[in-house]
Amino acid sequence: MIIIEKIKRGLIVSCQALENEPLHSSFIMSKMALAAKMGGAIGIRANGVNDISQIKLEVDLPIIGIIKRNYNNCDVFITPTMKEIDELCNEGVDIIALDATFRNRPDGVLLDDFFESIKKKYPKQCLMADISSLDEAINADKLGFDFIGTTLYGYTKSTNGLDIADNDFNFLKALINSNFKSTLIVEGKIDTPLKAQKCFEMGVDLVVVGGAITRPVEITKKFVEKINQVKR
């Protein structure tokens, strides 16, 4: 696919701000995407059709689109149903990312069936699997996802608190050694340039960074926390 050729190697910046965050604005996210492009990003990950629409007006970079939507406190909230797929496809997005964990989806549809339905309805749409474990990655590769992302590693009940860098990047090593047909994208807790660099040194070609670049509240807190540790 053409999009896979366009997004071969480099940094993807996740430009997202939730409703309770001060930068929550499609206009602001479009400018954040522009800043990311000016800094050398080769792609953008964005949440919601409003943000995506504005970002497309500002930059010509490939976009990984998602819709975060909660259904009855279901754990799966990243592009969880066909409704969100339809919205993203109607807007037009290069890659759609969705929760590809083994957790129950809000509509009760199994991931394998969901993937098949998407491919039947939108056969040319590139899809990214957001996974949290090696078994989920193996399953996503078997299904035929174009991309596999480590997005949810550390964010599910079974992986809560884990970091991609734990045990000298052991989880990432296992993924790389699996030699997937799908393109691997490292995402989640890549909070320093050195972590990103390490991923590339290991052979990864695509890394997504979000909060470390685009969430000034959290960035400020880290500075304040370190400053406050100094006793005088």
From Swiss-Prot:
<comment type="function">
    <text>Converts N-acetylmannosamine-6-phosphate (ManNAc-6-P) to N-acetylglucosamine-6-phosphate (GlcNAc-6-P).</text>
</comment>
<comment type="similarity">
    <text>Belongs to the NanE family.</text>
</comment>
<dbReference type="GO" id="GO:0005975">
    <property type="term" value="P:carbohydrate metabolic process"/>
</dbReference>
<dbReference type="GO" id="GO:0005829">
    <property type="term" value="C:cytosol"/>
</dbReference>
<dbReference type="GO" id="GO:0019262">
    <property type="term" value="P:N-acetylneuraminate catabolic process"/>
</dbReference>
<dbReference type="Pfam" id="PF04131">
    <property type="entry name" value="NanE"/>
</dbReference>
<comment type="pathway">
    <text>Amino-sugar metabolism; N-acetylneuraminate degradation; D-fructose 6-phosphate from N-acetylneuraminate: step 3/5.</text>
</comment>
<dbReference type="InterPro" id="IPR007260">
    <property type="entry name" value="NanE"/>
</dbReference>
<keyword id="KW-0413">Isomerase</keyword>
<keyword id="KW-0119">Carbohydrate metabolism</keyword>
<dbReference type="InterPro" id="IPR013785">
    <property type="entry name" value="Aldolase_TIM"/>
</dbReference>
<dbReference type="GO" id="GO:0006053">
    <property type="term" value="P:N-acetylmannosamine catabolic process"/>
</dbReference>
<dbReference type="InterPro" id="IPR011060">
    <property type="entry name" value="RibuloseP-bd_barrel"/>
</dbReference>
<dbReference type="GO" id="GO:0047465">
    <property type="term" value="F:N-acylglucosamine-6-phosphate 2-epimerase activity"/>
</dbReference>
<protein>
    <recommendedName>
        <fullName>Putative N-acetylmannosamine-6-phosphate 2-epimerase</fullName>
        <ecNumber>5.1.3.9</ecNumber>
    </recommendedName>
</protein>
